[in-house]
């Protein structure tokens, strides 16, 4: 087999691998060829024609040429230069050069840079204004008069994000980008991911925050300076002086526009990007091809929802309650109050009378210090985090079967899989960038997507097959499918023999899991389950993703175990494109648990009850550690009611809204002797506190986050803390020192060094190795070697073998006669969790102003209600009043309530957890949020819709197509390929 081909480039021979993109090869040799429509994250689009070169004597586009034979390539002869100039002239016919007064003149305008690098001095075709106005959406705007029709935005929308909203109407006299069937941006199905603005090579598609703000002389139009620009063009011998002026102005901008690499503070995907700031103003968020988790993709929150950073509701001074009212105080007083109360409670009731809840929004280093504060300084293991509310059952299931509590591969593997199975995950709204990778794999590469969910969300709509089991019955069909695969000799016997223990015992436990049993339990027809089982067994590679629809059940641990059992039986571990993916909900919920903010585990999931583990930490900490596992979140609340817990310190967590059965939780808060809350805002939970400490968000500190794929990434401080707020790690250090300890960390890197010394899972992690966009996926060996795919050398048990885990099922779903409606709940794309951060961005709030309840058309008809009706939902634990959105995303007596009730403005009004109960998964104490029933009372029969009429949910209008459909451009009567004009 031929390994390399000879390519002669401008007279010099090179050995090149077959399949290499010619344009990429030319660039790799530091040879300049213009390529305005090409983007390395998207590949060839073929609209601009600027990348023409001569290949074996013929002028062709280099961007779409694959090196599949020996070639002679010329980039410099006259014919090539003439063809390139013709293409560049056509671009300037569509785009006015007013660089010095353009907000996009920041050194990265690809039109400016290309014209300058090519040496263009004059344009042949005069710029022609088009008969269109600018179109403004909430977050970005489109200027048709600057658009060169490169189609990058279309490619991004159609084939990268796969939101399928944007296209080019090539049939017009003056083609332009349109949204849906030619409606304004704000009336379209656009989900505001912002990737169109990210990839635009010029100022045609641009973030609203950039407009009029980026340059020294910019305004929203060229304005009065346009005449000067035209005069300069005519007076100067070429464009060189004009570019020199704009380059100087762009260089000046660097003095006031700061570009800082950070990691998104919302979901668990772990998107990284540069945030552009001018003073405290956030101009834009710019992802990079080097971003390891997301590449150039973002969602509306990561790209645009940064209003919380400069919100006027930010806490800037400590608050201490005096005579029932909060008063601003200096840090010294607040720290004294905390130290005095912690000391008094510990002396009176013992260390286990104090409890600590860590934040999945904070950094790894801060989570580590929170548990260190609890264990070293106070002497208790009463420390936990919000993985208790969502992901603990998934971790339990994976610990049982494969030994590591994390995704078994990378996000890339989700794209490589032949089959993706989504169970109880609203991926397109909870993890939108991951969903885009899977939608792309399905659309372009034939991946099969199977969705099991009680709600018809976007991924269910797009699925090759969609199954709607009864609530909480996934374990039944998972085990029945596994049994069928084994019974019909479809299991991977070789894989099981080499890599899996306990097969015989496990197989016996499957005896009752017949397909008939599964159909009765789940309501999914036996024939559909059989077909799924056969496809799953025969697929070359399978990944299974799951989230809160599985974990937030009273059998969440067992259902998660059943998922891993199925993957083991089919041999879908230890290979690219396979494995288990419990999609983590928060930006650092994985890392928070990794750092030991758990009652029974210290860093890296080392048992606090193990003598050798405690001895290691005791040597580092200089104190004896409590050998008894502490209380988890659920047990803390119970302990408060039982008089065992007297103090609670929590940060970055609105527990009084997000815990289940919040009437019970709030009643517990009122019983506490002393409560400390640390947050950006005076949250609903903070209103119960005795001391509230002002904390700094992610843009105001350094640190690391660990995402859902176990990827550890650095974030860099972009802004100074607002007012007297402080990073959480500095606050913990101040409290520890006020209590008599001598913590002396100067920078979070020192904290991570300590973690690495104590934690085999993070042994080789250091800030040097995480510089810039570099990342590591744990476990990380001391030499820095990481594991993007787990278990290649064996599973995380002593003998290297996985374990099949026997299960049973008696969790039939039965609807209560009185509480006859099943309440489902979860996230929305625009908001995160309770919405404390996202509601601070006005345009996010404009898109989704309040929480609501989704009701099926059949239930609405049965109760005689319509869109906008107001209803009261009543469960055994509480009641909530919400407005109705009628939609076929839910069916029958299933309803869906988003989590975002804007608690800072509305308190607990409309909060889903007024309805949830205190039932939990028996192995992890994770609340059974998804196992809630209620009855419905009608307050008003109709009203104003709770959704903005322009919200994409109201009227889906997607316009799917493949890429930019450049052939329609080529078919136009006014188009001639530039190469044809110079070919002889």
Swiss-Prot record:
PROSITE patterns: 2FE2S_FER_2, 4FE4S_FER_1, 4FE4S_FER_2, 4FE4S_HC3, 4FE4S_MOW_BIS_MGD, MOLYBDOPTERIN_PROK_1, MOLYBDOPTERIN_PROK_3. [4Fe-4S] cluster 1 binds at residues 95, 99, 102, 109. [4Fe-4S] cluster 3 binds at residues 157, 190, 193, 196. One of its GO terms (biological process) is formate metabolic process. Binds 1 [2Fe-2S] cluster. It holds the Pfam family NADH-G_4Fe-4S_3. Residues 138-165, 181-211 form the 4Fe-4S ferredoxin-type domain. Residues 252-984 are annotated as: Formate dehydrogenase. It is an enzyme of class 1 (oxidoreductase). It comes from the Bacteria. Keywords: 2Fe-2S, 4Fe-4S, Iron, Iron-sulfur, Metal-binding, Molybdenum, NAD, Oxidoreductase, Repeat. [4Fe-4S] cluster 2 binds at residues 147, 150, 153, 200. InterPro entries: 2Fe-2S_ferredoxin-like_sf, 2Fe-2S_ferredoxin-type, 4Fe4S_Fe-S-bd, 4Fe4S_Fe_S_CS, Asp_de-COase-like_dom_sf, Formate_Dh-H_N, Formate_DH_asu, MoPterin_dinucl-bd_dom. One of its GO terms (cellular component) is membrane. It catalyses: formate + NAD(+) = CO2 + NADH. PANTHER family: FORMATE DEHYDROGENASE H, RESPIRATORY NITRATE REDUCTASE. In the C-terminal section; belongs to the prokaryotic molybdopterin-containing oxidoreductase family. NCBIfam families: Fdh-alpha. This is Putative formate dehydrogenase SAUSA300_2258. The lineage of its organism: Bacteria, Bacillati, Bacillota, Bacilli, Bacillales.
